[in-house]
């Protein structure tokens, strides 16, 4: 049974016949927030996950991203897949078009409204379209392993959706609501759940209950959560906003092995949710006492199922972009006895982002925008591949994946159960001004390919990014 059991065409929010429209190529959204961050944000923000899922039974990597209408700043939730047998991608499917909403023009390009996805036990693709302090949407594919047509399942207040499929147990969804501040919740939907049951979103579990206190509690402005799943375990790493500034700091971790009925810290000790104060057993490290900001990038598990968190630190009060102190990429790893902290490298922007891989043979990798790009100090840069062979204690840059780029590359995302041929996905975009945005992926060795921006047929083969750069260097699209 799948999540979709019990759904009828009449219960869904879209007509029962026909296919969703498609685009004639892969164009990412360009987005900015008051100069705080800007660029090609098709895979933004870091607290959205997952963006891609590999399913071996059909040898396809399904993925979503924030697309756009070429020449406009109009966000569309897109879904597609990479066919590993044929080495091709289809035209991407438009699942949700924010241009058809009643949002203000500036909100129609808001990268916070990007989608995430999950593939259920029957192979149906579910797309979770984020709101931003308002309603989001959930869509499900009509056919297993097919992204041609979707039905809307529900509309509900939902920001930063993180859906995870737990084998033989169902869906676990982390998400955020902006009731008082940024408050984190979870929701479970076992196999066979009907729409009527799925609609009981008014009683989700609550992970934190920070509120803005009258006395200006410096920790009381909510949090961001970054999640992962392995087997029956779900986990969340969190930071929190500090006072009425834009600083965010501290590092928290919680996990559950029973779909949220009980929660534990990394050492297995019970923890009663929600978190109500920063100084609690879930706090890994009080970075604010060290006057450091914390920007979490990715949460994963090592080969023994122990959590590892990739994050960046910057001096308190320091602007996200521009000259200043170092932005230090750091790995926090639970060794089984304690949290160990290991620096990796430094970069130029608080919102630089990568993915952490802890492989079964003991190799750890980071793929991310750690190198200076063509728009220095802006979000992203050039992409590099780093490796560690001592559980993240020391790191070496193995390979630079992009170089001489026209735009910064940003938000490198790891697929669930990543196939070696489709190991990371990201986008580029001008960090200074609106521009076109292309989508890229690489294999485990770091060879980069670019998704086609213009398609004349139903399928196309992604080009080598190096070959594309050489052939298009004289005719690259300018800023729009």
Question: In which residue ranges do the predicted regions lie?
Answer:
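Bacterial N-terminal signal peptides
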Residues: 1-4
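Cleavable N-terminal signal peptides
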Residues: 7-8
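Extracellular, repeat-based ectodomains that mediate carbohydrate processing or recognition
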Residues: 12-472, 476
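Short, solvent-exposed mixed-charge patches
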Residues: 478-480
